[in-house]
Amino acid sequence: MKDSFLFPIVFMLIMVLIFAGILSIAFRTSESKIEAHRQNTYQKRILSTLSAKIAETTGSKADKILAQYPESYEKYVYKINNKNLGRNAYRAVVADSTVAFCFEIGGKGLWGTMQALVSTSTDFRTILDFAIVEQQETPGLGARIEEEWFLAQFRNRLFVTEPDAPGDVTRKYEFIAETQEPENDGQLKRVTGAT
């Protein structure tokens, strides 16, 4: 039988079935852990975008609020159930008062879609923080959008200039090369390959 031309085919088929079965069992047994980890990571990102405002309001420190996850998430963060928004939205509540909002945003990158979280002040005029949830950019270049220097430049940025004015009231920013230094508050550094 070993000299038969069918032996390698049957052997490979049996090996494929065995290893596919092992892989399927491993996936099914770890699926709930993977989903729980994904959910925890997402909630921590939401909390991180809201933690500075929560800390400012409570007199605590943002690091302490983050360290107390999941209790701090359950205490301060509430999902906004509004189907008209068309996206996930959350609010930070301290002493029965909303102190900030967090919205999920998305768009196209060079290699795939991206998801991010942006937190705003309650009047929606200021971007408080920004965090990348998911991106599929090149690890050496485009994925640099997750680096602290890039994310930090969006913190506490004015988003709406004159809310009562007619027409477009959003603040315009100019994107400059990463190697340049911003000359004014209206310039943000960009990463080539991550738009």
What are these regions (language model features)?
Residues M1-T195:
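Flexible, solvent-exposed loop/hinge segments and secondary-structure transition points
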